[in-house]
Structure formats: C-alpha cells, structure tokens
Amino acid sequence: MMRRLSTQDQSFKQVFADLLAFETVNDPELLKTVDQIIADVRQYGDEHVLKLTQQFDRHPAHQFSDLELTQEQLKTAFEALTAEIREALELAAERIRSFHQAQKQEGWSYVDALGNTLGQKVTPLDRVGIYVPGGLASYPSSVLMNAIPAHVAGVPEIIMVVPAPNGELNSLVLAAAYLAGVSRIFTIGGAQAVAALAYGTQTIPAVDKITGPGNRFVAAAKRAVFGQVGIDMIAGPSEILVYAEGQNNAKWLAMDLLSQAEHDTVAQAIFITPDEALLDEVAQAIEEHLAALPKADIARTSIANRGALVLVKDRDEAIELINQVAPEHLELCLDESEAMSQKIRHAGAIFMGRYTPEAIGDYCAGPNHVLPTSGTARFSSPLGVYDFQKRSSLIMCSQEGVKSLAKAADVLAQQENLDAHARSARYRYQ
C-alpha cells in the first residue's frame, strides 16, 4: 500500500524529509571494488576488460575484437525493423534532433569602446562516450537521447558501450545507434566500461566526457573518474511527482505514477492534491492497475517503500513541496498548469496539462529524458547539446586599447603581490 500523508499532520515535515532521503553511492565496499576495477583496467587494458566481461556478463567472446560491433551489424538491425517500429523510432529521432538543434550555441564577439575585441568561441568535444544499460530489456530511447545531442553539437566521434549478457543484445538498441550516428560500439558494461572510456585501452580510445545512466557500479565509477573526464550527472532512481486538482481521470494519474514505479524498487512516485476525494480515487486506481501490471512486484515495492499520496491544503502549499522535492519528472494536471509552472523553480522536466503523460517525454516529445534526480534539479539541468560543447573566451587588445587595461591590471597585480603579472602588463603601456 502507498502511504498517505497530510501536511496537517504534526510529524509531516520529518516524515516527508525522510521519504526524500536517498544516498546514490555511499557503500564503502562498493567504492573499494570500483576503485580496484578502475586501477586494473588502467594497468591491463583490453585484457582485463575482456576478463570482467566474460566473468560478469558471461559473454562468449574469445578475444577483445569480438566485443566490438561493426557498422554493418547496426545497419542490418535497422533494416530488419518492422515498418511500425521503424516509423516510431524515426519519429522519435527526428523530434529529439529538432528540439536539440534549438539548443546549439554559437560563438560571438564584440569590440569595446577601447577598441579591444572580446568574445566567446564554442567548440564541440573531440570524443564522447555514452553508456547504455544492456540486456534484452535495454532502452533504445537512451541511445537516441544521449547520442543525438552529441551529434547535433558536432562531436566527431561517439563511442557507445552497452553490456550484452550471454552475448545477447536488443536489436532495437543497435538500430537506434545506427539512426543516431554512433561511431563505434563495444559490448561491455559496468565499472570496467566506464574505466575503459575514461582512460582508454589498446582498442578503446579515451573520451573527453561520459554520459548515460547505469547501475550503482556505473554511478560509482563515473564519480571516480570525474576530473579525468567530464560526466553528465550521477543518476539516482527514477522519480515522478504528479500534482492534480479539478476534473481529472484517476486511472490516468495512477498509471502515470506507476510508469516510474515499475522502473526500480527504489524509484519514487509522489502524488499531491488538495482534493481528498481525488486522493482516494487515485489510491484505488493504483491497486486496480497493479493487479494487471507485468512488473507489479517491482512497482508495488517501489510505492510501498518510497511512494506517497500527499494531501495539501492548497496549491501554494503544493508548490512549496514540489520545490523542496525538485523532482526529476513533474506533472501538473490542472487547467492553470502553465501559470503554475511559472512558480516551479526546481524540476528536471515539467509536463503541463492533463494530456501530457510523462511517458511521452521518455520517448518522443523531443526534450531530453536524461534528467537530474535525487533533488539535484536544484542546481543542474537535463542533458543537452550544451553538455557536448565547451566555451573558450576570446580576448584581443589593440595597441591603444590595451593601455588603460594594462594600467588597471598593473595596479591590481601589485595589490596581490604578483610582480611578474604587474610587469607583464606594464610592458604594454610604458
């Protein structure tokens, strides 16, 4: 059963805070294991990655070259799709590409009053690695959401890793990689794949940034290699917060909550409303849906451990709670959803109106589904083209324009006791 809370309860603040508390990577033994894997991959390269892939994934590969897929294999997988699946995948890819094209940043410059040129140069990263969760239940949508923004950014080389338990792969993942323009694919996973991308091996080139979700070993490895390479984020369990008032279909709302609860036993689904009757209806609809849901066991554990039905006194109180949660996915199911969204400061993605289920955003709306979790929407953003670009400042002083700037730099450098700085500037105006 999903717990029911009311903001009028005396213990609500503490209970709600406890509900939100979750440590993504905080197991000393896990961190020790991951550190050892990374060290071994750095020392032994291909040999150790192959060994761990055979051990953990039971992959039948005899040599490292068996772990790399060819472009011909990707093309074959794409061409083997049924017309219906191919059209859906192409629609999703087209919409994702179109949305992310609007994010692409360009350089700029201007000449100041002193005649100096100042600006910013935008450059794509040279090479990126994308991690895609593997197995027969893997997600082609993750391929599109990670690879397409990199492609739009102008990244010339995209390396993808995806584990293949028992050597088996979801052909739709390969088709998505073909459609998204992935350069090379290796059927490896876990901390060893992250280490290989970060430091390189005899076969896998080192990348500049690693993106994509994975299990706790992957999350720990990404945290460990950060600094050697960039990363997108440390992904926690999936989250959804649904706020509803007025006329709503309780069955729709309940299924929206379960759409995230079915991901993982530690996923989080929270429903907030000022309408107690609607709260009752949603609670009942959840139980009815669970009776027929294939992943009911996972969803039931998720909502029992980390889910909640929350009764608030009004919309303003709900907004306070939403900003406290900073949810990965936020649905606003009411007539004034756009107006309410203006008061939301912290959320990964905001789905406005009764006809906008979170699932649309997962696949084909266009915006990225790689979103900040565990409250990190307070300070971070969805994955985007900007994650695959970097900026360099441009400064060019004219012979006359440098004089006043150099005098100021000279004075400030002296105050910081940096004599070489001061003299360097002074040479330009004396």
Swiss-Prot record:
> So what does this thing catalyse?
L-histidinol + 2 NAD(+) + H2O = L-histidine + 2 NADH + 3 H(+)
Q: What is its EC number?
A: 1.1.1.23
Its needed co-factors are: Zn(2+)
Tagged with keyword Oxidoreductase: yes
Residues binding NAD(+) = Y131, Q192, N215
Q: Which residues bind Zn(2+)?
A: Q260, H263, D362, H421
**Family matches, as Pfam families:** Histidinol_dh (PF00815)
Q: Per UniProt, where does substrate bind?
A: S238, Q260, H263, H329, D362, E416, H421
Class of the enzyme per the UniProt entry, highest EC level: oxidoreductase
Name the Gene Ontology biological process terms.
Answer: L-histidine biosynthetic process
What does the record note about the cofactor? Binds 1 zinc ion per subunit.
CDD domains assigned to the protein according to its UniProt record, in alphabetical order: Histidinol_dh
UniProt entry keywords in alphabetical sequence: Amino-acid biosynthesis, Histidine biosynthesis, Metal-binding, NAD, Oxidoreductase, Zinc
Name of the molecule in the record: Histidinol dehydrogenase
